[in-house]
């Protein structure tokens, strides 16, 4: 009787708990496309933070509002664009990292150039 009860409890645990856990572990969220329009002004970007998940495609349209401005993602040489007033620049990339990665202005746009940066914050796929 005790052995039968133990089997029943084990099977019930598998059906209710472990099966759900296995399903959750095997679940992969579908990558999204995130469209972001960034306005670059002397000394700052709007917005300054892009939130994404690892595996998402981010499409950035950079608009220079006063003078030329750049957008380069630290450690990713292929993510590097420059926009001029009235001439937006665009780039798309797949987020292939976890955590935060900085972007910064690559064009010496004036005295506040050094403060021109932002952050792409990526969370792991499991945290969706």
Where are these regions (language model features)?
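N-terminal Sec-pathway targeting helices
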Residues: 1-12
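Non-catalytic surface loops within mature trypsin-like serine protease
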Residues: 40-42, 64, 75, 95-97, ...
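Extracellular/periplasmic metallocenter environments
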Residues: 3, 15-31, 84-128
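Glycine-centered loop/turn positions within well-structured domains
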Residues: 43, 69, 99
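Extracytoplasmic/periplasmic/luminal assembly and interaction segments
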Residues: 50-92
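Soluble periplasmic/extracytoplasmic beta-strand elements of cell-envelope proteins
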Residues: 35-39, 59-61, 72, 104, ...
